């Protein structure tokens, strides 16, 4: 069993893993959405009543449909979910959407965003104290990288007599390193 992992939030929620979310990593962002043929008239989630929906995420979809009192048939498909309506396997789909270009190329339109997702750092709930200490050091480094993303590092050769003027033009976060 692994102590740490990086996983998409969508996979984490679908599999209902017994792990703890340690950090939201801010990359691999996408959304899980319902989509239907672009020529279909859509007036809300009740459109899916009695319809067939293809997905690789039946657990998340079932919770959403139940919450909205929608009775639909869920067809579990792994890979190329977006072709299902075009070949008559489903009336709509529930899948990952990033830019939406795959939906457009399959004559689909996004009609409901059910959940947003990004990469997560997760941990085994039974990590020992030494590993937790190492994890805290890793998180410190992650935070340092994130806080430095919009900052610039400037190095120069200048006479010490000009330090005051240089600091006025290029102040550091706390102070310059000399």
Question: What label would you give each PLM region?
Answer:
Residues 33:
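Active-site-proximal cofactor/substrate-binding loop regions of enzyme domains
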Residues 1-4:
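Extracytoplasmic small-molecule ligand-binding "clamshell" domains
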Residues 6-28, 38-178:
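Small-molecule-sensing regulatory modules
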